[in-house]
């Protein structure tokens, strides 16, 4: 996948928790090609699931 697309997706789910709810069943960290984007995704996922953002 394109790094820019990965970053756009991360930005979308970070700014809109409902976007995460729509993709959480089929998207996981392995979807991301960049290691840093995988870590960012896991962090966002943890924050959203724990109602911290």
Task: Show where each model-derived region lies.
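Noncatalytic partner-interaction/assembly domains of nucleic-acid and motor enzyme complexes
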Residues: 1-53
């Amino acid at each position: 996948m394109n790094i820019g697309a990965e970053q756009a997706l991360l930005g979308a789910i970070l700014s809109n928790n409902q976007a995460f709810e729509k993709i959480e069943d089929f998207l996981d960290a392995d979807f991301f090609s960049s290691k840093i984007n995988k870590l960012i995704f896991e962090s966002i996922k943890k924050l959203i699931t724990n109602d911290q953002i």
